[in-house]
């Protein structure tokens, strides 16, 4: 492997500090309101990404992108057939998780990482039932991306009776403990190790790409058996950062356009409270997953780390976002008494993650978008007569005949747009926040 290029940012040197990394990007989401999984959703996600290519960037060779990726629901039927070739029987949908893992190319280091992964799976009361090396086509990559691309494997993890949120929580703890253990026991040689996703609901395909290279690199994304009811995409523009495989988005729950200007304070606040944190759902596991924020991660990655913790501790994704990106709620702003009380209460728990931000997010069921309270990044939406919703940094990422458009608009500062694929409907900002601020 050519160590001139790495999958992570370089160490602090001179005036450069990786802690100051930000990026400005293109984001998008597509969802079938009915919740029906279809390969068309994957194709639409790829099309959105292609039409956001101008919001991304390339490095000096002009064929290595800053990063692109797609997040979608686990394609159960696809994996069922793929693993059947190796005589591996998957359990029912939702009864297992899939870890999408970037591994170092050095055989010995990769073997050590895999050994630790299997050890942590067993320690969590789960069971590794199969693995699959993800098919990739390196010929589409630029020299820089090709020199540092990892080996990419999918690990299939039996829930041993756990499903739903319980399994998601167990997989979250397993992943965090694994990450800490790899850093502690292997260290620098395992810099290229990264778990892009470990979930029973969603999976992330991403890398150091320009938008057209994503589907070319991952043939899975062109397989008609790969189906989903939702997809989130991201094209990265590293304004003052180094491109890397691990910092490509989407992360595990979000794709983010903008920058978190309060990042250092947010990370310090989390670190200060880690010893005092408690959770009836996470219990003693909480002490094993700290630090919450991965070392060397970007501002978007740190945001995702925090949001993931809040969701796994029992809050809904919209609730977590309301805590992290509150609306303007000072005395001059006209909001309900309940909502103001909610924001004032949570202000004592969570420092706002302030800065220009447009975020699309999903927990595998809900899909939505939100803006920072100043509305400093754009997010537009389209609802079609075919029950499709498109959220993106700009209009026109997918063209529809005017007669097929039921509704279109833009997100307002601090507001949220939400689709529930189980209830099969769009939920307004007032409704979702009204329920959250009144719940006990």
Model-identified regions with their sequence ranges:
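Conserved short alpha-helical segments that host acidic/polar catalytic motifs at enzyme active sites
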Residues: 2-440
């Amino acid at each position: 492997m050519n160590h001139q290029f790495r999958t992570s940012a370089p160490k602090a040197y001179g005036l450069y500090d990786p802690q100051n990394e930000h990026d400005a990007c293109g984001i998008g989401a597509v969802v079938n309101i009915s919740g029906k999984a279809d390969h068309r959703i994957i194709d639409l996600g790829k099309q959105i990404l292609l039409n956001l290519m101008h919001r991304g960037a390339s490095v000096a060779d002009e064929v290595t992108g800053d990063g692109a990726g797609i997040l979608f629901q686990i394609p159960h039927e696809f994996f069922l057939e793929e693993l059947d070739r190796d005589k591996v029987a998957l359990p029912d949908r939702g009864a297992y998780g899939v870890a999408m893992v970037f591994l170092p190319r050095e055989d010995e280091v990769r073997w050590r990482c895999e050994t630790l992964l299997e050890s942590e799976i067993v320690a969590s009361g789960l069971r590794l039932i199969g693995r699959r090396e993800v098919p990739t086509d390196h010929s589409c990559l630029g020299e820089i991306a090709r020199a540092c691309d990892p080996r990419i494997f999918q690990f299939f993890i039996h829930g041993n009776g756990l499903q739903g949120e319980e399994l998601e929580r167990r997989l979250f703890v397993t992943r965090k403990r694994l990450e800490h253990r790899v850093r502690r026991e292997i260290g620098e040689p395992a810099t290229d190790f990264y778990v892009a996703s470990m979930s029973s609901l969603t999976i992330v395909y991403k890398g150091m790409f320009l938008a057209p290279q994503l589907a070319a690199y991952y043939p899975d994304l062109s397989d008609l058996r790969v189906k989903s009811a939702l997809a989130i995409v991201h094209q990265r523009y590293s304004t003052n950062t180094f491109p890397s495989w691990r910092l490509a988005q989407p992360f595990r729950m979000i794709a983010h356009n903008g920058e978190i200007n309060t990042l250092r304070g947010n990370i310090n606040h989390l670190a200060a409270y880690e010893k005092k944190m408690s959770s009836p759902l996470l219990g003693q596991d909480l002490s094993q997953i700290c630090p919450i924020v991965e070392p060397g991660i970007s501002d978007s990655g740190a945001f995702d780390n925090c949001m993931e913790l809040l969701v796994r501790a029992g809050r809904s994704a919209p609730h977590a976002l309301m805590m992290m990106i509150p609306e303007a709620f000072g005395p001059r702003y006209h909001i309900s008494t309940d909502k103001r009380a909610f924001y004032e209460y949570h202000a004592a728990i969570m420092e706002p993650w302030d800065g220009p931000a447009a975020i699309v997010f999903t927990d595998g069921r809900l899909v939505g978008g939100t803006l920072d309270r100043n509305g400093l990044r754009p997010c537009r939406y389209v609802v079609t007569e075919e029950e499709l919703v498109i959220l993106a940094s700009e209009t026109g990422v997918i063209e529809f005949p005017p007669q097929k458009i039921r509704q279109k608009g833009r997100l307002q500062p601090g507001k949220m747009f939400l689709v529930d694929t189980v209830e099969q409907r769009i939920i307004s900002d007032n409704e979702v926040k009204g329920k959250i601020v009144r719940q006990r």
